[in-house]
Amino acid sequence: MNSDWKDNHGYDYTARLSRREWAWEFLRRNACFCEAWRTCQLEYGILGYDAGTTMLVSQFETPRLTEWGLLYSSAPDQDALTAIVFWSPELCSSVLRMTAFPLSARIDATPFLLRDIACASVLLDVPSGPQHLLFADEGRGLQLLVEGEEVVRPVRLLTNGAPKADLASAQLRSLHCFNELRLTGRLSPSSVQRDPLSPRLRHVLRVLDADLSGAGREEIGEVLLAEGRASERWQGSGRAL
């Protein structure tokens, strides 16, 4: 968490966060989630490493963190630039759904070699479930749900048909991001969509951090709204932050 909510520059890292990354920023500040995260840590283990890929495994077919919309996450004290977060595909429309075929398959798909990707990746294995693959590059993330062949081996990847209407826009953006990743090996800033509400969310996040730190209403008002307007904007005990 940001230890000094009064330092506006301490929130500069949020300027280009996507919607999924903003979700993490707010979730990691939830005390009940932090407690749930601590109790779930023995559920996961590290299978090993393959080039730039870290391989994780969950003991349960349905990880307990799904109650919070997650399959896995690193520690809540890590901000969106450094955290590893697997969102539940049922809740996160940007998770790209794909099928992996062997190289010998006669399909129109370019071979995909995970080792050729320059940015870091994490592979989460869930018993009796599909593979979950996350690419992370300087705070930008792309999450894939992959069925079929093991993606750590050379495969051919195809998207799982036309997405539903309510998922189409997010899936097309993720597919564009994946195609650029396949070509360049990186997740460029232009390939990950910044949430247009970021300036507003940054302000809300500062207010939340101030409240969590125990700051009073007048103190928050003086810092965020300017001292001369604090009493006017923040008067009245019934007004919510």
Which residues does each PLM region occupy?
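Mixed-charge (acidic/basic) macromolecular-recognition segments
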Residues: L157-E232
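Short, surface-exposed, charged/polar-biased interaction segments
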Residues: E43-Y44, T54, P199, G228, ...
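Short, charged/polar micro-motifs that form catalytic or ligand-binding hotspots
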Residues: D12-L27, S190-L197, R206-A210, G238
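DNA-recognition helix of helix-turn-helix
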Residues: S231-L241
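DNA-contacting interfaces and partner/effector-binding or oligomerization modules
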Residues: M1-V155
